[in-house]
């Protein structure tokens, strides 16, 4: 590298570091006109390690036990049927584990064991691939619910939210905004997480929840459905997520989008920093002006 190029790079190092830390986008007006804040969970409201290091391992280590204990229950059989159906749809995928047919009335213990083993293998394979299919998320939610009810997972075990999350949400609510959750985890799992928080039951903070039954988070149409369901123009919805593959379709649907940088999250690329507003804390989005007043102020200015 030439001396002149080196001097230019050294001269801009401070600017580059500031841009990486704060991003090139002005976030001061990000809440302008926003009536609904839509939140991702993992890596946004909640440490990514909580889900990956605590909840997911619980499912992996207890799925066989859960199936054995709840085998004759209708809900368990519905979970198995959903996984079986998904496996059939995935039959062209490498390594897919198909699940044999079997009912609770089947007296063949060997048949039951084969089904149980196939379900376990299927679940572990899908989790290893980090699949977001509804059948898997449904079973996970039911397992976590049972774990909470039996004390296998206790309330104090759930250090759910970053410290800036609840104060920011309360502030948004006070200024007339609504807050919704959109996560790959089932709605039931979402409610367990926020209902058993160390900060108490936080469910009252949310106007509603969305999961993969609405659509995959990487599909533009999913965000259009959410906007229609909440009765809000996409332009008046702000979606916060740590995943660019989710930010892109939400923006394509017309929503405002902001990426979150949290400890343990995957690093953003230079392109990500350039293309999206980025925050490290919800406190950066504090606002004391209601969306209605903000919109009327904008009309007056024109």
Curated annotation (Swiss-Prot):
Annotated Basic and acidic residues bias: 16-25
Biased composition (Basic residues): 1-10
UniProt protein name: Enolase-phosphatase E1
UniProt cross-references to CDD domains, sorted A to Z: HAD_EP
Gene Ontology MF, one: acireductone synthase activity
Keywords: Amino-acid biosynthesis, Cytoplasm, Hydrolase, Magnesium, Metal-binding, Methionine biosynthesis, Nucleus
Residues holding substrate: 183-184, 217
EC number annotated for this UniProt entry: 3.1.3.77
Cofactor(s), names only, from the UniProt record: Mg(2+)
Quaternary structure and partners: Monomer.
GO cellular component, one term: cytoplasm
Catalyzed reactions per annotation: 5-methylsulfanyl-2,3-dioxopentyl phosphate + H2O = 1,2-dihydroxy-5-(methylsulfanyl)pent-1-en-3-one + phosphate
Cofactor binding note from Swiss-Prot or TrEMBL: Binds 1 Mg(2+) ion per subunit.
Family: Belongs to the HAD-like hydrolase superfamily. MasA/MtnC family.
Lineage per the UniProt record: Eukaryota, Metazoa, Chordata, Cephalochordata, Leptocardii
